[in-house]
Amino acid sequence: MSKSSKLCRKTSCPRSNIFCNLIDKIVKRPSLQFLGQWGYHCYEPRIYRTLAKILRYVDLDGFDILLSDYIAFVEKSGYRFELNFNLEFTEICVNTILYWVFARKGNPDFVELLLKKTKDYVQDRSCNLALIWRTFTPVYCPSPLSGITPLLYVAQTRQSNILKILLQYGILEREKNPINIVITILLYPSRVRIMVDHELVDIQEDAKTCLVLCSRVLSAISIREIETQLSLGRRPIISNWLDYIPSTRYKDPCELSHLCRITIRAQLLTNNMLPNGIFSLQIPXRLQKYLNLES
């Protein structure tokens, strides 16, 4: 048996599949036929360059094809790898995809397409196809082991248009400690995006919008936890931040309409029907928009 066949055995994989073709190129290189011995740093550059060349100029249709190829590769490719190589290859691919979608493009349409294509896997955080739970490195680095999730990155950069999409798909509701996202929006150092003064204004407005959006999802926001951070010397990105969190999230009784929204969204979330399931409900369009966090 050849060295490359020891590494991977092909049973059925479309020749046009981007990731199958990439594997073929890697294992056929004489210098990389002992992948387990040399480690990911030997083949990571080729994976990144190949995917980056596609993602740099890809349109939505092309991105749809790339995601379909990745899903087919993971689910049905028939490849059998050494365990370490399999993990490393998929992690590098996911890191590259998320890096380009969130850190380089920052295009809401691409984010929404990624969520649509992978929503069937989102309930299993350990699944390689639950891309929204995988980590990536915002300043590209081959290993994403010390990376962050897309939701945390969007909170750090206060990309309100993308945060809204993530929230509509129930990503914040799936968080174990959603208050951490609120704290990140409010207190994370603004140098992530600030280059000139006018961008500071933009990021402050985005931070306000992000706080309002989170208030549409959560029933309670712990002001005490925020104030604890402030007492440690951390400075909020906006001075009047409390004006953008309704008093019904931390002091007054929560509105009945909001409690109903939370309950309905929770049921839809359990059945993995956010946000599309909202629009199949036999209710007025105004209430559908309310459930979809439009107001």
Curated annotation (Swiss-Prot):
PROSITE patterns registered for this protein in UniProt: SOCS (PS50225)
InterPro entries referenced in this protein's UniProt entry, alphabetically: Ankyrin_rpt-contain_sf (IPR036770), ASB17 (IPR039147), SOCS_box (IPR001496), SOCS_box-like_dom_sf (IPR036036)
Keywords: ANK repeat, Ubl conjugation pathway
Metal-binding keyword on record: no
Pfam families: SOCS_box
Domain of life (superkingdom): Eukaryota
Keyword Metal-binding part of the UniProt annotation: no
PANTHER family (alphabetical): ANKYRIN REPEAT AND SOCS BOX PROTEIN 17
Cited function: May be a substrate-recognition component of a SCF-like ECS (Elongin-Cullin-SOCS-box protein) E3 ubiquitin-protein ligase complex which mediates the ubiquitination and subsequent proteasomal degradation of target proteins.
Family per similarity comment: Belongs to the ankyrin SOCS box (ASB) family.
Protein name (record): Ankyrin repeat and SOCS box protein 17
Organism: Canis lupus familiaris
